[in-house]
Each structure stands twice: as structure tokens, then as C-alpha cells.
């Protein structure tokens, strides 16, 4: 399963671990993803989405119906 937020599109980024001696080794910064069930009142069912914490805040702000219509317009099958 890919580590991508379906709402925001956040995906893993790359960077460096830097020690006190300034030695650098490559690492990945992973998004804070959660598999979360959202109740959709208009469809009278739960929808399970893999979203980041920022994605959850967007859903709280805009509403699940608006976010779902935007995702379906982008071509996501939900």
C-alpha cells in the first residue's frame, strides 16, 4: 500500500540524518497517515480513507461530502 494521503497528496520525502559530527546518511520523512473511517450521512455508510493528520483537518473544515465530491472529480474511485 502506498504511503500517500488521498486528500492532500502528501507522500514520503527524502533528506538526511545529521549526526553531531555532521555525518549525513539518507533517510525518508514519512507522512503521518491513518486509516480512518468517516461516516457519510448522504450515503448512509462509512467510507475508509488513508489520510494524513492534515487531511483529517481539511475534512473537518470542508466536510466529508465536499472532499468526496472533489476526490471523485479527480478520478478517485470511492
Curated annotation (Swiss-Prot):
GO cellular component terms listed in the entry, alphabetical order: cytosolic large ribosomal subunit
Keyword Phosphoprotein appears in the UniProt entry: no
GO molecular function, one term: structural constituent of ribosome
Signal sequence bounds: none
Record's keyword annotation contains Ribonucleoprotein: yes
UniProt keywords, alphabetically: Ribonucleoprotein, Ribosomal protein
Pfam families listed in its UniProt record: Ribosomal_L28
SUPFAM superfamilies: L28p-like
InterPro entries noted in UniProt: Ribosomal_bL28 (IPR026569), Ribosomal_bL28/bL31-like_sf (IPR034704), Ribosomal_bL28_bact-type (IPR001383), Ribosomal_bL28_sf (IPR037147)
Single biological process term from Gene Ontology: translation
Family: Belongs to the bacterial ribosomal protein bL28 family.
Protein's UniProt name: Large ribosomal subunit protein bL28
Native source species: Francisella tularensis subsp. holarctica (strain LVS)
Amino acid at each position: 500500500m502506498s504511503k500517500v494521503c488521498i486528500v492532500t497528496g502528501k507522500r514520503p520525502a527524502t533528506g538526511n540524518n545529521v549526526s553531531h559530527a555532521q555525518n549525513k546518511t539518507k533517510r525518508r520523512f514519512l507522512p503521518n497517515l491513518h486509516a480512518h473511517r468517516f461516516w457519510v450521512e448522504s450515503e448512509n455508510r462509512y467510507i475508509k480513507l488513508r489520510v494524513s493528520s492534515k487531511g483529517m483537518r481539511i475534512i473537518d473544515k470542508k466536510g466529508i461530502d465536499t472532499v468526496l465530491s472533489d476526490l471523485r472529480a479527480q478520478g478517485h474511485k470511492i
